Amino acid sequence: MTLYDENNLHIIKDNLRYLKLLSKQYPSISSASSEIINLQAILNLPKGTEHFISDVHGEYESFTHMLKNASGVIKRKIDDVFGTSLRECDKRNLATLIYYPEQKLDLIKKSEKNLEDWYKITLYRLIRLCQIVSSKYTRSKVRKALPSDFAYIIEELLNEQGDRVDKQEYYNSIIETIIDIDRASEFIIAISNVIQRLVVDKLHIIGDIYDRGPGAEIIIEALSKHHSIDIQWGNHDIVWMGAAAGCEACIANVIRISLRYANLSTLEDGYGINLLPLATFAMDFYKEDNCENFKPRTIDKNLNKTDIKLLSKMHKAISIIQFKLEGKIIKRRPEFKMEERLLLDKINIKEGTLNLNEKIYKLIDTNFPTLDKENPYELNERERDLVEKLTNSFINSEKLQRHIKFLYSNGSLYLKYNSNLLYHGCIPLNEDGSLKEVTLCKETLKGKSLLDKLDRLAREAYFFKKDPESKLYGMDMMWYLWCGPNSPLFGKKKMTTFERYFLDDKDTHKEEKNPYYKYRNDEKMCTIIFEEFELDVDNSHIINGHIPVKTKEGENPIKANGKLLVIDGGFCKAYQPQTGIAGYTLIYNSYGLLLTSHEPFSSIHKAIVEGNDILSSTIILEHVSSRKRVLDTDSGEEIKKQIHDLEMLLVAYRKGLIKEENEANIRF
């Protein structure tokens, strides 16, 4: 308390109004002192485990399994606790039981001859494991993680040692009673879920929940139930967020990508988006067009010829609409400097050519039934009606709106957390490696200020419903974040969607990356970024997604001498033949950083029936001799501030500046 002697009393007086409010929560010296003791104790607990996952791309089965096994953390805990006392097959079965308790129990009940014996052994093992994973938390925090049905019993078992002679009968009788009253299955499910929850204290999703995979809505539903999560938006997330906000160009892009990969389940089944008007429109305008270049790219999907024909026509129809809608934004926003993407007016329908950068290219598809030569970016009456119907469908999808609000409330363009800087794409740079200046809303911005501004504009796109002008600019910016040349999410000079559909020349398909990617292995670049974001240069890391790591070509996810880590999760099956693996995830626990590479996941069914887990290899990036504690984290800094405030409150009580509440009043 020496800080608050007579010489520093003015500090307390200056904060008296706040301290009086704080006294409502801690109305006595006793209550304030108790809280200081509690908080000081928390500071000395081990740091909680953080789990970093990126680029999920809608692949819900792989992601669900990764979430359940915490990138191998649960298996490592089983190894730590049971070592050589359990066979490998028993460890594997125990892990699978924790991941999928309901499904695994159904199988065990059918095959196990002595179920009561199995229950007893398994309960002891699960309780022992739960004791270990809960040991780094306060009892209060563990209590909040417990299911109400079994909260008291689990807490008793966690805080008792079964090998203590004086409590052994008590401990054993609880377990035997659980089995006797036929509640063992429910208890196993409950404690397995508690273990899953406690092994990871914080989950970071570094972008691209959405894309071509079939279950983005399933993933977000699961994430919305997670106890502690943050999200750094990816380019595929932002285009869906823009679509939900009502940005027509984003809506067209979302539908086009879904049709390109024959993934309509998220749109139709997940969010109830009605695509029948698009199908009708496509059949009317492209009836005689085989739309060869718009055939869906399918992996593990059996589509009949009729389905492929319809999807191809819908795909082409929405693509042309997309180019028109994008043209309107480009013309409306000259500050975007995207005039070179205005290509519809460069088409010579009669000659079947495109004038691209003063060079004439032959078009491989020359059927443009909805294109007006005089006004190529104008929607015809049928197109305008279709776009309005699709927009209404997106805006009025209750589930989509709920999921996008979740992304807004738990997400941002970047995050500083425990000396790590998390973002999906890049920080735009110049060719010389300096931070690139970008002019938006008559402001010239770069680095952190640029991302902060873009983050605010993205929120205005969704929430500024009573300010149409700001909302429209925000929606246009959402589209820019998807494909603009200085977008930190896109990270490329241009998106050559039109060229890939209509030109054979592969050179026109190239998408030049921002210089950021050239400098990713340069520690100087990391230093520039750390200083820009006010992070400790010596002890910070950039954790990045977006670009798959081509492991089979020898690429290393560890860049700039460990300052930058690329953890594209590799969930997207289309990239796996190129990368050679199924991507990387990161674990940051009290002992250091662990980078885990993963082999492709077979299926949840095989995981349950055969005990197949994702095969993973772990690299220890950093290992500390002394475990990191809560006091070394951002949460620790907040707790220190709380302690500081409570110490001021104690002095205020003791100096008579604030009166303690009568103990009787406090109690009654």
Swiss-Prot record:
Enzyme class: hydrolase
GO molecular function: fructose 1,6-bisphosphate 1-phosphatase activity
Disulfide-bond pairs as recorded: none
Cell wall biogenesis/degradation recorded as keyword: no
Record bears the keyword Nucleus: no
Superkingdom, taxonomy of origin: Bacteria
InterPro entries reported for this sequence: FBPtase_class3, Metallo-depent_PP-like
Keywords on record: Carbohydrate metabolism, Hydrolase, Manganese
EC number(s) reported in the record: 3.1.3.11
Pathway connected to this protein: Carbohydrate biosynthesis; gluconeogenesis
Cofactor: Mn(2+)
One of the protein's GO biological processes: gluconeogenesis
Catalytic activities: beta-D-fructose 1,6-bisphosphate + H2O = beta-D-fructose 6-phosphate + phosphate
SUPFAM superfamilies per record: Metallo-dependent phosphatases
Family, per entry: Belongs to the FBPase class 3 family.
The protein's name in its UniProt record: Fructose-1,6-bisphosphatase class 3
Organism: Clostridium botulinum (strain Loch Maree / Type A3)
Organism classification: Bacteria, Bacillati, Bacillota, Clostridia, Eubacteriales
Gene name linked to the record: fbp
